[in-house]
Amino acid sequence: MYEKLIQDTVSEVLPKVVEWRRHFHMYPEVSGKEVETSLYIQKELAAMGIPFETGFFQNAVLGVIEGAKPGKTIALRADMDALPVTEQTGLPFASKHEGVMHACGHDSHMAILLGAAAVLSKLKDHIAGQVKLVFQPAEEEAAIGGGRNFVASGKLDDVSEIYGLHVWPELPVGVVGLRPGNLMAASDRFYVHIKGKSTHAAQLHNGTDALVMAAHFIIDVQTLVSRETDPMENVVCTIGLMKAGTRYNVGVEDAYLEGTVRTYTPALRDKMERRLGEILKGLDVMFGTKSELNYVRGHSATINTPEKIRFLQKIGKSYLGEDAVVEPQFPSMCAEDFSSYLQKIPGAFMWLGTGKEGTPALHNASFAIDESILPLGVTMEAAAVLEALGE
């Protein structure tokens, strides 16, 4: 309905979108420290005449565009934080902050949302309702809970639907991935401390070797995936860190392990937490150790509202072309705290393809998007609002 109008307006604001993306890329800030990023967003919103609110949660910014007539409220969301990664892209606008990089594309997400804001601000006479622009800190740090705290602030209580996106190197450039239901996994983290009793390595019968118990635990948890989980379900249980021992000829008194669990369903998530604890208790009895499990729940699974995905699929085919819209066959085991919004508000999360031969993965020090995808993201977000709220 608004194809020509949106396409022309996107073309008009595109140079600014590229400028925004490159600025964000040059000045990344990690979770909870997005101070200058927040101030820059505020400055750009003010320059567009878009009112905004801050101070309700860390460095979050909430912009508001009022349409010409009353109606429902739709939200668009972008995450703001970068990663503690030393950039190796060689880009002329590479990070100027040593050891910090936008290696997950959040620079693009913010630029796209500002671009959608620019388009919608210019076309607000066509809008019957309100648009909330959600600039969210701390997506990468589940302990802070950027999405969870934004929802808890109450600022989105009047929102009837919400949309967001993530650049996705596993899809080709120019393609938008739209999948109903499960899109991304729940991500939990666990910490294990195994307490034994140290002794001379030649007299291990006088002590309790925490390292041997840790080795058994590592092996035993693999059966949670291969022997205790329905093969039609998906789960990942990875132990990525183990620290144990002080010297080659001393039996190990303390062993520490850290790992992650990824699931798609609440029931399987609960089961994994319970079974990790039960395995530890059983091994304590077997080896005489004393163990502690600290299981920390992170982002929940990202589950798209099917109706909203169908809505976006129709928009994508109309605005970008039939071949530009794909439905990914499988969800990802990566996690996203857009899930926090979808637990309360109907909506959908898109994957914006940026993959071509040799494109590094997300979180890689050489990751960089193809900037030709920026207008596609702006178009999808702006069109979602206008098609839902347009007169």
Each predicted region: which residue ranges?
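Metal-dependent amide/peptide-bond hydrolase catalytic core
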Residues: 212-391
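Divalent metal-coordination and catalytic microenvironments
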Residues: 24, 63, 76, 106, ...
